[in-house]
From Swiss-Prot:
Annotated ranges, domain PPIase FKBP-type: 169-264
Subcellular location: Cytoplasm
SUPFAM superfamilies cross-referenced by the UniProt entry: FKBP-like, Triger factor/SurA peptide-binding domain-like, Trigger factor ribosome-binding domain
Upper taxonomic lineage: Bacteria, Bacillati, Cyanobacteriota, Cyanophyceae, Nostocales
Family: Belongs to the FKBP-type PPIase family. Tig subfamily.
Alphabetical GO biological process terms: 'de novo' cotranslational protein folding; cell division; chaperone-mediated protein folding; protein transport; protein unfolding
NCBIfam families found in the cross-reference section: tig (TIGR00115)
Coiled-coil stretches: none
Keyword line: Cell cycle, Cell division, Chaperone, Cytoplasm, Isomerase, Rotamase
Any one annotated GO CC term: cytoplasm
Annotated InterPro entries: PPIase_dom_sf, PPIase_FKBP_dom, Trig_fac, Trigger_fac_C, Trigger_fac_C_sf, Trigger_fac_ribosome-bd_bac, Trigger_fac_ribosome-bd_sf, Trigger_fact/SurA_dom_sf
Name of the gene encoding the protein in the UniProt record: tig
Catalytic activity reported: [protein]-peptidylproline (omega=180) = [protein]-peptidylproline (omega=0)
Protein name: Trigger factor
């Protein structure tokens, strides 16, 4: 079999394959023989159908098409093997199948073209001496006070209040019913449109402006128990329920009771109630340590993201469609698993209409992820960065001890750990051989959009899910 190769874009190898006359004839005859054994034709037993009858009943074009399918499949497989091509994914026929049927004659040579994806060639122009900027996340001691105050609020006792009007910080018990406010030009005599789910009885609302839609809380402030009034409010835009987004509303509100919060004292008893610590001092120290580490981890992550973003700029690679589609599949699978774990019906979210849109929107991120991964692999290859079995086993043992009750696939865990350790080593090497300048938090946000990897599509679908469920 004669095979001619050519290099194509998107990391493809083009193949021109010429099949010998002997093979085209032999395959055609074999197809006729096989069909005569399997086709049911009245008046004839299987395997005893005369050749001419078979050709008349099925048609020569049908038989040629069946033979051609075998010739193409076998021809491509043999060509890949003969040329020692490390193909990935499924081969693609470049010639027109219909044209091949018309030109195919058993006993004559058959020439057709196909293409296969191969692993891409990576040209890493630079990977040492990279320069980037990353935001430094500094620990703020005020976070400890904020967390403790939040815990106090959650443990607050509600005390009924008499003799005064509602004020910010109170908890109001109200009945309310909401309608869409009429716009200019609406029929004045028409019944106002009720807001779906916009009514409640004995509803407790904390009088903080961010607890409800804008205008609702401020409308209650100043009311006395027993008062009823109309409160104007405005649904934000965007809003979970897009049909209500940006619309003005009127709520008829009756204030039934006012309560104020009595907060527990910040002392050792409080610490024991909200944590496993015996003293408030120990609780504060633990929180401070946690948020200090969190700030350090975020800073390190920012450094890594900045460095990887810079590395990608120096990678020249023509990605094959097979790898891109595989990465998109992985991203959507991760998203589906995350949504399923949240209790959402993935089958209702991933409809036949939305999947193609999600795939298209996921492509840029898939390409970015692939470039990062291939870039790291190339650095490891050039610098001989590896992980030892001892390092892998140590991390596996650590993880197993952390999750003793989990049913863990040991082989899969080892693979994941090996990949993680290798990535960590490569990134540490890059950090040691590059310069990442730390700049104040927020100073880069407006300059360059942050590249978030797996979560982007998840967040997109989660918004759609919330709209669907009305949550």
């Amino acid at each position: 079999m004669k095979v001619t190769q050519e290099k194509l874009p998107a990391s493809q190898i083009g193949l021109e394959i010429e099949i010998t006359p002997e093979i085209t004839q032999k395959t055609y005859e074999q197809v006729i023989k096989n069909l005569s054994r399997t086709v049911n034709i009245p008046g004839f037993r299987k395997g005893k159908v005369p050749r001419q009858v078979l050709l008349q009943r099925l048609g020569k074009t049908h038989i040629k098409a069946a033979a051609l399918e075998e010739l193409l499949q076998d021809g491509i497989e043999q060509a890949i093997k003969q040329e020692s091509i490390a193909a990935i994914g499924q081969p693609r026929l470049r010639s027109s199948f219909d044209d091949l049927i018309n030109s195919y004659e058993p006993g004559q040579p058959l020439t057709f073209t196909a293409a296969v994806d191969v692993e891409p060639e990576i040209n890493l122009v630079q990977y040492t001496g990279l320069e980037a900027k990353a935001e430094e996340i500094k620990y703020d001691p005020a976070r400890v006070d904020e967390v403790l105050e939040k815990e106090r609020q959650e443990l607050a006792t509600l005390i009924p209040v008499e003799g005064r009007s509602a004020q910010i910080g109170d908890v109001a018990v109200v009945d309310f019913k909401g309608v869409i406010a009429k716009a200019e030009g609406d029929d004045e005599n028409a019944e106002p449109e009720p807001i779906p789910g916009g009514d409640a009885s004995d509803f407790q609302v904390e009088l903080q402006e961010d607890r409800f839609i804008p205008g609702f809380v401020t409308g209650i402030v100043g009311m006395n128990p027993g008062d009823t009034k109309e409160v104007s409010a405005q649904f934000p835009d965007p809003y979970v329920n897009q049909e209500l987004a940006g619309k003005p509303a009127i709520f008829t509100v009756t204030l039934k009771e006012i309560k104020e919060k009595e907060l527990p004292e910040l002392n050792d008893d409080f610490a024991q109630e909200v944590s496993d610590f015996d003293t408030l001092e120990a609780l504060r120290a633990s929180l401070a340590e946690r948020y200090q580490k969190e700030a350090e981890d975020k800073t390190k992550n920012n450094q890594q993201e900045a460095l990887l973003g810079e590395l990608v700029k120096h990678i020249e690679v023509d990605l094959p469609e097979t790898l891109i589609e595989k990465e998109v599949d992985a991203m959507l699978t991760q998203t589906a698993m995350r949504l399923s774990q949240q209790g959402l019906d993935v089958k209702k979210l991933f409809t036949q209409d939305i999947i193609p849109q999600l795939r298209e929107r996921s492509r840029p991120e898939a390409v970015e992820r692939l470039k990062r991964s291939l870039g790291l692999q190339e650095v490891a290859k050039r610098e001989s960065i590896t992980v030892t079995p001892e390092e892998i086993q140590a991390r596996v043992t650590e993880l197993v001890q952390q999750y003793p009750d989990e049913d863990i696939d040991a082989e899969r865990l080892q693979t994941i750990v090996e990949n993680e350790l290798l990535s960590e080593k490569i990134i540490d090497w890059l950090l040691a051989n590059s310069t990442v300048e730390l700049v104040p938090e927020g100073s880069l946000a407006s300059q360059e959009p942050e590249i978030t990897a797996p979560e982007t599509e998840a967040e997109t679908i989660e918004v759609a899910a919330e709209s669907t469920t009305g949550e």
